[in-house]
């Protein structure tokens, strides 16, 4: 009961904060300060992690860079705010960050009660389980009685409880606030099982002391549509963040890459001309509050969606995650962009 009351109070408080924070045009604020403030994970290889020099890279980081490129024509005009699962929502609601690009699941509660706008989904994921091979477990249905490491304040924690209850299994939750704490506890043997989004398991396995000693079980127990989130009340900023994603998708579909984007401006295809802002009467960029070079600037900065995926989490990365649902609609996946016209 106490937890429900606290949750209700938090929801009411952040709704009030959100209404104030979104009253001003975010684009104007971003331009005035000269950079995009992007909320990211505290450190998740492939998605958002700093190197020894403090330089950030990853799938979500590239989205932050793409937004900066669209707004300023300069992908370096972005600053990163590392946030834990517990910290991320207050940071967005209060205006501390302009956009949250932090492997965050879109849910009805977050979309309504917390006052966020999600969509589009830039990564379709699902929750899974990682165990030590020595446990001799082949299925999540064999995990009854196991100690399970999980991060609090996440859909992962809620899905875990639902899955074990539905399947009449018992488990002992080992709960931590920060991802680094969960990872360290699992690596130290404080729990038998690690559960989070499957993409996260592939990422976190790389950081373990003996990665090859661990396996990811086949079950996917949830739908985890991940993507950037912004505050409600600013449709222009929401449109910009959304169309940054769609530009990445459309670029891949058109075959426009980081290497050939300038050459593709010469394409006779009117759809490509319109997309790249070279059509004589194109107003797509200005309708967004950007220049007509917005899509070109995005692609020059980070490439297309396929390039962003492969470089950070796909075939060209240590994670080697397959595209799956995140392939384009015409290649067996469900990623596609609305018409650019």
Task: Label the predicted regions.
Residues 31-32, 68-76, 93-97, 105, ...:
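Sec-exported extracytoplasmic/periplasmic mature domains
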Residues 24, 31-101, 283-284, 290-293, ...:
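Extracytoplasmic small-molecule ligand-binding "clamshell" domains
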Residues 1-9:
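Bacterial N-terminal signal peptides that target proteins for export
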Residues 37-46, 56-71, 105, 125-181:
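Bilobed "Venus flytrap"/periplasmic-binding protein-like clamshell domains
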Residues 17-24:
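Sec/Tat signal peptide C-region and signal peptidase I cleavage site
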Residues 65, 69, 73, 77-142, ...:
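Acidic, polar ligand-binding/catalytic clefts
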Residues 78-90, 173-188:
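Short helix-initiation/N-cap motifs at beta->coil->alpha
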Residues 62-65, 69-71, 134-137, 141, ...:
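Extended ligand-binding regions for polar small-molecule ligands
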């Amino acid at each position: 009961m106490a937890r429900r009351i606290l949750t209700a109070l938090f929801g009411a408080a952040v709704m009030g904060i959100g209404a104030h924070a979104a009253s001003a045009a975010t684009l104007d604020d971003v331009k005035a300060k000269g950079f995009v403030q992007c909320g990211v994970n505290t450190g998740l290889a492939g998605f958002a992690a700093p190197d020894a020099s403090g330089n950030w890279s990853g799938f979500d980081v590239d989205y932050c860079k793409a937004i900066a490129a669209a707004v300023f024509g300069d992908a370096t005009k972005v600053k990163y705010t590392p946030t834990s699962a517990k910290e991320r929502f207050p940071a967005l609601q209060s205006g501390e960050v302009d956009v949250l690009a932090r492997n965050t699941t879109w849910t009805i509660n977050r979309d309504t009660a917390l006052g966020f706008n999600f969509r589009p989904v830039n990564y379709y994921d699902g929750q899974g389980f990682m165990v030590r091979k020595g446990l001799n477990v082949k299925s999540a249905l064999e995990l009854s009685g196991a100690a399970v490491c999980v991060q609090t304040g996440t859909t992962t924690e809620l899905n875990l409880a639902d899955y074990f209850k539905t399947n009449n299994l018992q488990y002992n939750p080992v709960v931590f606030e920060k991802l680094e704490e969960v990872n360290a506890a699992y690596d130290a043997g404080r729990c038998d099982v690690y559960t989070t989004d499957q993409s996260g398991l592939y990422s976190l396995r790389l950081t373990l002391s003996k990665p090859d000693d661990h396996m990811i079980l086949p079950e996917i127990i949830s739908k985890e549509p991940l993507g950037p989130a912004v505050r409600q009340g600013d449709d222009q900023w929401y449109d910009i963040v959304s169309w940054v994603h769609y530009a990445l998708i459309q670029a891949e579909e058109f075959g426009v890459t980081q290497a050939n984007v300038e050459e593709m401006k010469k394409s006779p295809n009117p759809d490509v001309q319109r997309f790249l802002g070279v059509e004589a009467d194109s107003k797509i960029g200005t309708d967004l509050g950007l220049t007509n070079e917005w899509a070109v600037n995005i692609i020059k900065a980070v490439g297309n969606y396929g390039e962003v995926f492969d470089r950070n989490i796909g075939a060209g990365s240590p994670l080697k995650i397959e595209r799956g649902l995140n392939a384009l609609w015409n290649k067996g996946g469900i990623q596609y962009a609305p018409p650019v016209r």
